[in-house]
């Protein structure tokens, strides 16, 4: 139990864990992979020592693993392709309480006293980015394995709670979705498509639950391929559709920075102007080196009740061939949890 479990291509990996929940439980260092096509288990390279209740994230064929017991200055890295482990000595010593992968980027949830914040880890440089915004809603605690949908990290405490916190890895903002129907502990979050599931748990005065709650995230992701020529400029058209006055959508644009360069935040306005907001467009995040731009598009004019809101982003091709552009639209709308029958 309490192993790290994740899916990679057609395999499910199980790393570490412990033999039971008792005080005499033995820590496990074993690693196994289950192939969903052959329905066979395969033994993989062991951890250096037994580990349980790990924080972990997957990025570019590698798994990054942190101990959640006390502070650490190390991360263990598993190479899926070569079936080997290595240890990286980190640039600082910190208390890691969770980790998540967002579009092949590694984020680590750290605590400092009662404060907690997400921080991006750059494996190629073995460096941490600047500290993210401190969570304004809750103090540091023990959290279950987070789930990710369209650049947002969803997390819930293992102790009694009905609250689910959300961290937007692109805009560096915290929020909360509507509360779950049941106040429970040890419930597990899982994600599939645009749906979040809260599975099982324990309810005070009732016992172990066999219920599943479901929450649907209002998000639309479009992935398209562009044929480009190295050195040529192009315009990425971002269309939020017809928005009524005051209605808003968050638009996240992702390109491969090795294949395409974002030249400016907009073809119409300067970066500073967009940060303040102009003609219904506000720049929330601009990271051209990572191929990321986040905009908030708000309906600001009336034209028969609604009008089409769009933005144009200038880019330059760094390759000749095909490259992929991902555009995600998230609507600022409150949804409710429901029970899965």
What are these regions, as identified by a protein language model?
Residues 1-220:
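Kelch-like beta-propeller repeat domains
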């Amino acid at each position: 139990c309490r192993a790290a479990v994740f899916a990679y291509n057609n395999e499910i990996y199980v790393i570490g864990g412990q033999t039971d929940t008792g005080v005499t439980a033995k820590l496990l260092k074993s690693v196994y992979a289950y192939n969903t096509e052959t329905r066979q288990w395969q033994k993989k390279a062991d951890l250096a020592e037994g580990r349980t209740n790990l924080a972990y994230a997957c990025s570019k064929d590698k798994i990054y693993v942190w101990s959640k017991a006390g502070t650490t200055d190390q991360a263990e890295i598993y190479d899926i392709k070569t079936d080997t482990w290595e240890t990286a000595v980190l640039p600082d010593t910190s208390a890691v309480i969770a980790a998540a992968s967002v579009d092949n980027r590694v984020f680590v949830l750290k605590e400092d006293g009662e404060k907690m914040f997400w921080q991006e880890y750059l494996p190629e440089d073995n460096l941490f980015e600047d500290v993210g915004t401190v969570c304004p809603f809750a103090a540091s605690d023990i959290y279950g394995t987070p789930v990710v949908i369209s650049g947002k990290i969803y997390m819930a405490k293992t102790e009694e709670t009905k609250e689910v916190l959300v961290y937007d890895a692109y805009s560096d903002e915290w929020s909360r979705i509507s509360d779950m129907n049941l106040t429970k502990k040890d419930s597990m979050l899982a994600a599939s498509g645009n749906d979040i599931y809260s599975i099982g748990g324990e309810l005070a005065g009732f016992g172990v639950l066999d219920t599943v709650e479901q929450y649907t995230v209002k998000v639309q992701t479009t992935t398209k391929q562009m044929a480009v020529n190295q050195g040529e400029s192009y315009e990425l058209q971002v269309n939020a559709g017809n928005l009524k006055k005051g209605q808003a959508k968050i638009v996240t644009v992702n390109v491969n920075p090795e294949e395409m360069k974002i030249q400016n935040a907009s073809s119409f306005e300067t970066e500073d102007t967009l940060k303040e907001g102009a003609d219904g467009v506000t720049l929330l995040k601009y990271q051209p080196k990572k191929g990321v731009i986040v905009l908030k598009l708000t309906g600001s004019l009336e034209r028969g009740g609604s009008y089409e809101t769009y933005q144009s982003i200038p880019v330059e091709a760094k390759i000749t061939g095909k490259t992929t552009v991902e555009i995600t639209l998230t609507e600022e709308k409150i949804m409710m949890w429901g029970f899965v029958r």
